[in-house]
């Protein structure tokens, strides 16, 4: 990642890499992580993944998601990204976890440090997908034990999927209902 060498306000040389304060104008410079949000959209025991249609990681499978807009809550960003990429409206639930990674624009820009926040999400029955070909080449639904290996962002997506799978394994199973004993009470008379 190329670090800034000059102040973005007054163009004076910076005395050190960020975080640093410019000696000439007192402007602070930081390399903050860019917030990103994604949704692990489940349908029963299956997870939806999208095959990326653009770089970086064109052709690799990914969790639907992307950068948060200015002042956009990560939950809202996750819902928006799923809708933009797949046409689905989802209900975002609890946080699965957070991971730090980098996002490379293939030489167009310095790599960005990203803070990636992932949420559990569900989609209503009968919902139809609509692919945005600029973003997504394909949508796939995968069982937890059949997730693909060709994954985007290997610095964190494998860990995200592992956490999702471990959550499924740890989830309490519905208990079988015990048969109720027959009531010995007489029914109330009807009025």
Task: Identify the meaning behind each predicted range.
Residues 42-84:
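Conserved Nudix-box catalytic region and its N-terminal flanking loop in Nudix hydrolases
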Residues 1-3, 126-191:
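Nudix hydrolase/Nudix homology domain
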Residues 1-38:
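Acidic, metal-coordinating catalytic segment for phosphate/diphosphate chemistry
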Residues 31-33, 57-60, 109-115, 131-136:
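A generic structural micro-feature
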Residues 24-48, 67, 120:
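Conserved N-terminal beta-strand and adjoining loop/helix that marks the start
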Residues 16, 89-98:
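A short coil-to-beta-strand element that immediately follows conserved catalytic motifs
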Residues 99-128:
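Active-site-adjacent beta-strand/loop module that shapes the phosphate/pyrophosphate-binding cleft
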